Amino acid sequence: MMTAVAIRPERLRDHIAAALGARLRQITLALEEVTVVLAAADYFDAMRVLRDDPVCRFEQLIDLCAVDYSTYADAVQQGPRYCVVAHLLSVSLNQRLRVKVFCPDDDFPLLPSVCGLWNSANWYEREAFDLFGILFDGHDDLRRILTDYGFIGHPFRKDFPLSGHVQMRYDAELRRVVYEPVSIEPREITPRIIREDHYADPH
């Protein structure tokens, strides 16, 4: 089913603006993609509207990830550090939407879980917790999903050291895996050099 809203994303933008009302912080249309920015306090209710509204009807959450804006485009980001970005899909109406919400507290990033709206949010939110340390209130099983249980820190934060904090290895005497401080010595990262095409051709 192809609707006029799907064909003309500006109509989707205008309808979402009307449907969300005061819950909407910002809405933009670029490259035929609609992006909305929500406040953390309005996040869950607004997402429910986007799922249930008959002109939106976003039945699927197809992705949810996080961004650390502490440094961005070689500049210090003004405002909150952590942002969660969700991508919604309406299969029945053939339209998509990007939703951004910033965590209000950099030291304790916390947002409501949307697992109650879309089951697919379960592992996405666990990944955002594991890699960025963002907590999701109401998630029934918020534990690490990619790193191991003894992992220290959140590796996608921009202040996380490249070498990590600890390493693990098999200890033959103890006959088990052990954790120990990382033994990699810091070294200067050499930038990759890409030469122009045909630089070695004879003149």
UniProtKB/Swiss-Prot annotation:
Query: Which Pfam families did the record assign?
Result: Complex1_30kDa
Describe the reaction catalysed, as an equation.
a quinone + NADH + 5 H(+)(in) = a quinol + NAD(+) + 4 H(+)(out)
Q: Which PROSITE patterns match?
A: COMPLEX1_30K (PS00542)
Its Enzyme Commission number(s) read 7.1.1.-
Entry function: NDH-1 shuttles electrons from NADH, via FMN and iron-sulfur (Fe-S) centers, to quinones in the respiratory chain. The immediate electron acceptor for the enzyme in this species is believed to be ubiquinone. Couples the redox reaction to proton translocation (for every two electrons transferred, four hydrogen ions are translocated across the cytoplasmic membrane), and thus conserves the redox energy in a proton gradient.
**By its UniProt entry, which SUPFAM superfamilies does this protein fall under?**
Nqo5-like
Species assigned in the record: Verminephrobacter eiseniae (strain EF01-2)
What would be the name of the gene that encodes this protein?
A: nuoC
Q: Which molecular function term from Gene Ontology is one that the record holds?
A: NADH:ubiquinone reductase (non-electrogenic) activity
GO terms for CC? Answer: plasma membrane
* Protein name as annotated: NADH-quinone oxidoreductase subunit C
What's the subunit arrangement here? NDH-1 is composed of 14 different subunits. Subunits NuoB, C, D, E, F, and G constitute the peripheral sector of the complex.
Q: What keywords appear on the UniProt entry?
A: Cell inner membrane, Cell membrane, Membrane, NAD, Quinone, Translocase, Transport, Ubiquinone
